[in-house]
């Protein structure tokens, strides 16, 4: 089963001319929208597919209004499996120019067959009827233990997604665990670690935070959400290393995420 979210992330001034043609450029996979760059096109069951892109050449009216729609299609082996067309999306081109950073977001079901998928996104600019498309392939791995739905927010309630970080700010790293085993009491036994490595390859703390989950998990829960707090106390480039160990099955899974923090101005 698929669910989809599409929309506009922000407005920027880039191209001064409006030619009547549009294009979709700079497609990128992210951990959330906005989110940190995702370096792999391999996904797991229960994960979220986030594709961001720039729609260039859109035409605004005298008040700076831009109207467009997005069609998202998911195909496997050349066969259309899922299709979603958004309602008209209206944006205000407050800064001028003719580029709209947009996105499509797909929630991958736990029962989705593994294999190779193709996502095609088509943007239609309503005023000129111009269209442009982008295609992104991804691989859905076999169902197993993993860390999914990674996203960064500036608040604990997960209402403020962010991918730009400055010193003095708070960062909440949100994620879910999938594919874990349960004991005779129907409870998991998981150990999740978040280790941060600096640009010199050294851990930032001697004892990284660890979450241990072994009780009070509802029997029907297949996706186990949790979050880690990160205090952005200095600038630099870091790697966040997440690891989950299932102490019942003996399996483990890990993910490395790049993190860059700038000095506050």
Where are these regions (language model features)?
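Intrinsically disordered, low-complexity terminal regions enriched in Ser/Thr/Pro/Gly
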Residues: 18-265
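Bacterial N-terminal signal peptides
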Residues: 2-13
